[in-house]
């Protein structure tokens, strides 16, 4: 969500009030640093005189438009959860490599009969970066079909700050968790024809932990590459299988960077075959033009806002886009952070204040901070001691989303950066890319995703722009529409929200099976 939650969670978290933005200073300093930009510079230890006047103006614009944000900022972090390090004998395997001397992979063979999430072979464990005290949790499920030959998928949720176990238990994984905290078999799990790795990243997400933090996508990419290299070293039987990276929401940032990092590594021991991004945030400068149309009746659903609110969104849009453009030009935290704060409040805020579900424009929130009460069942399930013991979890409290990470990424300027440039790079290198979007999502809506794919510069951009939109059929029924040229495909999924596998499990299952079978055109 975009917190994204998964990515979505991340999206929710971008609103200062929703994420509890806290950049509060010591009380002795509060009086002398009254403005938002002064607070921000103090928080990161930079002198205000060193900040360009134009950038300062961006912060002042935020403060003028949204005055309450100053009182909501605090420079503080929450308590770190207790860590329960497992004895060395708990782990079945340790994996190390001379090429990656700072990394180690711990592997535990899981007994499927204990948790009954699936009957397939499973492993869980941690990637350790001891020098930086970083520990990434993962859970691997073999394919239900032909694990020796089926593809491997790495699944990433977004936020930033949301656990990929949300994808496992809420969307595309082996089981759903019901109100009685029992796993319910999912016949449309994506591991029907692929083995899947669920990775909690960056650190301090889900069961991952660290005494430090990661606040930008590029740094996270280096750790993900190391994880994959050690994983495939331990499981050489998968090295020649197709390997895909898939995710949603803020993974629209993660995946392009991670895939580009992987392709830059000449000694990789696995076969990156494609990437899939669902309802992603990838090109903010284009996508932020489409919050007003989606909220105001132009996205295939009735308007949820009165005319004056829609007009106000248009009035503030020009300033929003100018701030994002400044971020694209400089890519500095002090330019990009005010763009995120201003635009998220001006373009997402009016919809969010209605109380409707930002992940599905058809629905009201039905409970919980992420609008889905079922997500609370997952948190409760994963906080049970017998579950944590079975997985080897070393964190005593599991949370679907970590709002501090969301805040850290926002204030590091990561939110508004032009990560679509990495998609151009991937396409130019010949890697197949699928961008899919449920058409009832608001926060990373299909209008914005369609728009940025249409204007993306790459070697075959002209051909993609001119390609015809065609019906996507599942079992003879219209399930969406797609556009394809060469190795680039955009797919609109009908009647699905931010999390397409949740709303349209059968159609999403067909989508991924067709894609990983090598049908990159959907013809």
From Swiss-Prot:
Its EC number is 3.4.16.5. The active site is at 249, 441, 498. GO terms for biological process: proteolysis. Residues 1-20 form the signal peptide. InterPro entries: AB_hydrolase_fold, Peptidase_S10, Propeptide_carboxypepY, Ser_caboxypep_his_AS, Ser_caboxypep_ser_AS. It is found in: Vacuole. One of its GO terms (cellular component) is fungal-type vacuole. It catalyses: Release of a C-terminal amino acid with broad specificity. Belongs to the peptidase S10 family. This is Carboxypeptidase Y.
């Amino acid at each position: 969500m975009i917190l994204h939650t998964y990515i979505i969670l991340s999206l929710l978290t971008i609103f200062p009030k929703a994420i509890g933005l806290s950049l509060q200073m010591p009380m002795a300093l509060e009086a002398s640093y009254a403005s938002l930009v002064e607070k921000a510079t103090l928080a990161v230890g930079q002198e205000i005189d060193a900040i360009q006047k134009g950038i300062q103006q961006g912060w002042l614009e935020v403060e003028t438009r949204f005055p309450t944000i100053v009182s909501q900022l605090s420079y503080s972090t929450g308590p770190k959860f207790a860590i329960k390090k497992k004895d060395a004998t708990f782990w079945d395997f340790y994996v190390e490599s001379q090429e990656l001397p700072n990394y180690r992979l711990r592997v535990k063979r899981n007994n499927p009969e204990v948790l009954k999430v699936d009957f397939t072979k499973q492993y869980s464990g941690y990637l350790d970066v001891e020098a930086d005290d970083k520990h990434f949790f993962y859970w691997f499920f073999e394919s239900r079909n032909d694990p020796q030959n089926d593809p491997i998928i790495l699944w990433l949720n977004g936020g930033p700050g949301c656990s990929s176990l949300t994808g496992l238990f809420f969307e595309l994984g082996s089981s759903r968790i019901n109100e009685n905290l029992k796993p319910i078999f999912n016949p449309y799990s994506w591991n029907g024809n692929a083995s899947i790795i669920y990775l909690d990243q960056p650190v301090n997400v889900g069961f991952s932990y660290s005494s430090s933090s990661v606040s930008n996508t590029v740094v996270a990419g280096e750790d993900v590459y190391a994880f994959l290299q050690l994983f495939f070293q331990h499981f050489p039987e998968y090295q020649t299988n197709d390997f895909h990276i898939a995710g949603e929401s803020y993974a629209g940032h993660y995946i392009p960077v991670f895939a580009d990092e992987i392709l830059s590594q000449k000694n990789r021991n696995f076969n990156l075959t494609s990437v899939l991004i669902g309802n992603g945030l990838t090109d903010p400068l284009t996508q932020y033009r489409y919050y007003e149309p989606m909220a105001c009746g132009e996205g295939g659903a009735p308007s949820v806002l009165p005319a004056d609110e829609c007009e106000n969104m248009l009035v503030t849009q020009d300033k929003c886009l100018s701030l994002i453009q400044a971020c694209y030009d400089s890519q500095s935290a002090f330019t990009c952070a005010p763009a995120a704060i201003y635009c998220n409040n001006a373009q997402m805020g009016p919809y969010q204040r209605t109380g409707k579900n930002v992940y599905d424009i058809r629905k009201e929130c039905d409970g919980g901070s992420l609008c889905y009460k079922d997500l609370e069942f997952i948190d409760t399930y994963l906080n049970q001691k017998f579950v944590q013991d079975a997985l080897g979890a070393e964190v005593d409290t599991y949370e679907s989303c970590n709002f501090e990470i969301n805040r850290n990424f926002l204030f590091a300027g990561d939110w508004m950066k032009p990560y679509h440039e990495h998609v151009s790079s991937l396409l130019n290198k010949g890697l197949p890319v699928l961008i899919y979007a449920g058409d009832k999502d608001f926060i990373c809506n299909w209008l914005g995703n369609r728009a940025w794919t249409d204007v993306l510069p790459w070697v075959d951009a002209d051909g993609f722009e001119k390609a015809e939109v065609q019906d996507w059929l599942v079992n003879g029924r219209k399930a969406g529409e797609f556009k394809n040229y060469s190795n680039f495909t955009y797919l609109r999924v009908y009647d699905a929200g931010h999390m397409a596998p949740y709303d349209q499990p059968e159609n999403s299952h067909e989508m991924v099976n067709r894609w990983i079978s090598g049908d990159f055109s959907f013809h």
